Amino acid sequence: MTTSDLPAFWTVIPAAGVGSRMRADRPKQYLDLAGRTVIERTLDCFLEHPMLRGLVVCLAEDDPYWPGLDCAASRHVQRAAGGAERAGSVLNGLLRLLELGAQADDWVLVHDAARPNLTRGDLDRLLEELAEDPVGGLLAVPARDTLKRSDRDGRVSETIDRSVVWLAYTPQMFRLGALHRALADALVAGVAITDEASAMEWAGYAPKLVEGRADNLKITTPEDLLRLQRSFPH
């Protein structure tokens, strides 16, 4: 499938979190990664894609860092209010897309602000494999290590069959209308939503797993940032 044959898409980047585990003086999406902020590098892969229709970044109301970035002035990038949790931020982002003219059956990709190493190859693979899918899905990586389940005392209770276990990554790609309904209903029901796929699962769907690269890391600890520094030229 050529690039022009890939489906057009919108993107939502939830970026209202603080990232307290980084022990930094600012949210992790604004930390330096080889001369640019993490979030700028995260946005690059989407803004450089010819099938992108538009991108919404969900930000804390008092965010002092975003306005100073070059990407904040891009005509392809819009801002939405961040929520108290990820699900609320994404829901606000979807509503902003509807205001921008997105339709219920349009594809939306939700991606972590602190996951800056997404490759064009992985993005295109996700778009291609899900282009005709009735549900949508997500980038994921098969578990490679032996997995153990613990009891309440921190002792092994069983070994889990890793052949059926995947690590959920982003982007996660769904139809705007279906994802909006799933998130809104889950929030009303008080369901704990950790990612968009979990909302779709709760709504009765079975998202497709699309294998991606393991180095599409989400920055969670200072060690993650140091590891990714080696992936970007200075």
Curated annotation (Swiss-Prot):
Molecular-function annotations in GO: 2-C-methyl-D-erythritol 4-phosphate cytidylyltransferase activity
Record site feature (Transition state stabilizer), residues: R21, K28
Keywords recorded for this protein, A-Z: Isoprene biosynthesis, Nucleotidyltransferase, Transferase
Keyword Protein biosynthesis carried by entry: no
EC number(s) reported in the record: 2.7.7.60
Keyword Transport: no
Gene3D superfamilies from the UniProt entry: Spore Coat Polysaccharide Biosynthesis Protein SpsA, Chain A
Gene Ontology biological process: isopentenyl diphosphate biosynthetic process, methylerythritol 4-phosphate pathway
Pfam families the UniProt entry points to: IspD (PF01128)
Function: Catalyzes the formation of 4-diphosphocytidyl-2-C-methyl-D-erythritol from CTP and 2-C-methyl-D-erythritol 4-phosphate (MEP).
Name of the protein this chain belongs to: 2-C-methyl-D-erythritol 4-phosphate cytidylyltransferase
Organism: Pseudomonas aeruginosa (strain ATCC 15692 / DSM 22644 / CIP 104116 / JCM 14847 / LMG 12228 / 1C / PRS 101 / PAO1)
